Amino acid sequence: MARETPMNPVRRISTRRLATVLSVAAAALLMVSAPASADPVPVATDYGGGCVIDPANRAATVDALRFRCSPEQQDAVFKASPRGAVPSGVKNGWVTRPPVMQALAPALWIGKTFYTGPDGGWLMNRVTAAGIEAWRADIYTAPALIDGAPTWALNYAPSPTPQVYDEIREVSPGVWFGYSWWRGGLQTTLLLAFVLA
């Protein structure tokens, strides 16, 4: 009958220690290589001179578009943005250019109320400080006049000023930037640029 040799106690401890070290190393490797469960933090885009579009800060984005972005930077922001989601509900609005309209607009226009679904809908402008709803526009996707890429078209054909045509893009979550155009007989002219939030 063969006799079993007992394992050396020093060797038994070393085997246990090795198993523990390997288990800890495997757990650490799994934690390091495991995918993150949190959503990535959106990154702000800095166009220079304080013109920063920050997806995590709606108020800072509106402030930048109103007071810090040059017309060229505003155009770059618009061109770099996808069409985005269509606005829904009451949105405050501010004219960003030209300066004379930026100063006059708050007495005449304070935003828009959107009645929309995922593919568009219609809106009413909020006019005067009382927010009276007027000047209906139909909303649908169309190529932007400025670059031909998809945009939300705000067509004022059903309003008293059918020559007016706006286009907007969601430049940051909950913030839309766009242009208001006058469609004349011979040419289409930019009237102003505006932001909604």
Walk through the language-model features, giving the residues of each:
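Secretory targeting and sorting signals
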Residues: 3-38
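Soluble ligand-binding/transfer domains with enclosed cavities or grooves
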Residues: 40-172, 176-197
